[in-house]
From Swiss-Prot:
Family: Belongs to the ArgR family.
Entry superkingdom: Bacteria
SUPFAM superfamilies: C-terminal domain of arginine repressor, Winged helix' DNA-binding domain
Protein's name in the database: Arginine repressor
NCBIfam families with a match to the protein in the record: argR_whole
Organism field: Chlamydia felis (strain Fe/C-56)
Length: 147
């Protein structure tokens, strides 16, 4: 158990201090700290903590989300669309899991759940009759403005 805590702390420190542009870079930084971790383990950990890739001066870098605000979400959500049974949200690569978690927490009373890939989220409402209202609420929550 102590090893997992040490690995978690090392990973958090890497992302909070300098970030990393690839999972391989995270593996290399861990290795320099004496921690051997495979790319697939790093990938699972990044999903677990809802790490996202944020564009910056040095290119996109993995980072840990801190809070929801207009600047952190607005550039990550590209569209919110829906049909008669499903809402589909397109996001920046690597941010769908974190955004889906925000939606799950905020809309737990009106949705059955979310399914997130790398850059796409499927949202299933409890009642199909309310889908347009839920889609608009999600859109407003995520600060996405339709054309």
């Amino acid at each position: 158990m102590k090893k997992n805590v040490a690995v978690d702390e090392a990973l958090k420190e890497i992302l909070n201090k300098e970030g990393a542009s690839t999972q391989e870079e995270i593996c290399e930084k861990l290795s320099s700290l004496g921690i051997a971790m495979t790319q697939s383990s790093v990938s699972r950990w990044l999903r677990k903590v809802h790490a996202i890739k944020i564009p910056g001066e040095k290119g996109a870098r993995y980072s840990l989300p801190t809070s929801i605000d207009e600047s952190s979400v607005k550039g990550l959500v590209f569209s919110v669309r829906y049909n008669s049974s499903l809402i589909v949200i397109r996001t920046a690569p690597g941010s769908a899991s974190w955004i889906a978690s925000l939606i799950d927490n905020k809309f737990s009373e009106s949705i059955l759940g979310t399914l997130a890939g790398d850059d796409t989220i499927f949202v299933t409402p409890i009642a199909e009759s309310t889908i347009s209202f839920i889609a608009k609420d999600i859109e407003n929550f995520l600060l996405v403005f339709s054309d």
